[in-house]
């Protein structure tokens, strides 16, 4: 079982450089087995061109390393907080992809300017606040997760599977590692489109609510009809 989990997480991680979402080692994917509570995550600081399935690190939700010769990603504590708080997710991605990270560094959420955005994410993609000095000094990675969880406590984390951390970068999630990667790719494209839209028309307004609703709910609503349902 753990070998299969490692293989899936390896394959998901290898999608990041394929889609241009990472430079050097600037990113990670994890996936959790909810039955055991174990998750696999990319090891810290290992180049993607040297990565192998057996290099994936198995962790539990208490932060204990169950299996692996390497240290886990430095963002592991953030992943743990999200898995503990968001029971309907099975995979998480963190990158420093340039367009999404540019929005994060600007401290801005990404407005929904069109249907590409609305097809996948309901509403503005949020940018959460900076951590305080105390939060950074106490437990930076854990408190990054705590901050994200706190932001989403009265929001639908399934309808909005992405967040920007101010001055840091994006996190996305999904039902498994591959879906979280898919959402990271979508986020990067949407971030690029939004930035270009504002360059072309600095006075642009968000897409009409009825259009955003139509595109999101035709794909994700109770009566969804986008794609094949069988």
Task: Cite the ranges covered by each PLM segment.
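Glycine-rich flexible loops
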Residues: 1-230
